[in-house]
Swiss-Prot record:
<dbReference type="GO" id="GO:0005576">
    <property type="term" value="C:extracellular region"/>
</dbReference>
<keyword id="KW-1199">Hemostasis impairing toxin</keyword>
<feature type="disulfide bond">
    <location>
        <begin position="32"/>
        <end position="57"/>
    </location>
</feature>
<dbReference type="GO" id="GO:0007155">
    <property type="term" value="P:cell adhesion"/>
</dbReference>
<feature type="disulfide bond">
    <location>
        <begin position="4"/>
        <end position="19"/>
    </location>
</feature>
<comment type="similarity">
    <text>Belongs to the venom metalloproteinase (M12B) family. P-II subfamily. P-IIa sub-subfamily.</text>
</comment>
<dbReference type="InterPro" id="IPR036436">
    <property type="entry name" value="Disintegrin_dom_sf"/>
</dbReference>
<keyword id="KW-1015">Disulfide bond</keyword>
<dbReference type="InterPro" id="IPR018358">
    <property type="entry name" value="Disintegrin_CS"/>
</dbReference>
<feature type="disulfide bond">
    <location>
        <begin position="13"/>
        <end position="36"/>
    </location>
</feature>
<keyword id="KW-0964">Secreted</keyword>
<protein>
    <recommendedName>
        <fullName>Disintegrin tzabcanin</fullName>
    </recommendedName>
</protein>
<dbReference type="Pfam" id="PF00200">
    <property type="entry name" value="Disintegrin"/>
</dbReference>
<comment type="function">
    <text>Inhibits fibrinogen interaction with platelets. Acts by binding to alpha-IIb/beta-3 (ITGA2B/ITGB3) on the platelet surface and inhibits aggregation induced by ADP, thrombin, platelet-activating factor and collagen. Inhibits cell adhesion to vitronectin, probably by blocking its receptor integrin alpha-V/beta-3 (ITGAV/ITGB3), and to fibronectin in vitro. Shows little to no cytotoxicity in vitro.</text>
</comment>
<feature type="disulfide bond">
    <location>
        <begin position="6"/>
        <end position="14"/>
    </location>
</feature>
<dbReference type="InterPro" id="IPR001762">
    <property type="entry name" value="Disintegrin_dom"/>
</dbReference>
<keyword id="KW-0800">Toxin</keyword>
Amino acid sequence: GEECDCGSPANPCCDAATCKLRPGAQCADGLCCDQCRFIKKGTICRRARGDNPDDRCTGQSADCPRNHFHA
């Protein structure tokens, strides 16, 4: 299966021919991906809205998880 979006050969993290991450790359895109690496745990990737807390990167994924408010 695809590891990354192989639509653009300009993406330095993704091999456009194979749709696989290039050697050494952890990710190709996402709010918690920077220069082919996961952003460190605790970095804010989405600011708080209303009563919800800031969403923070996990350090293990390129996706920005949604933190849910618990009353």
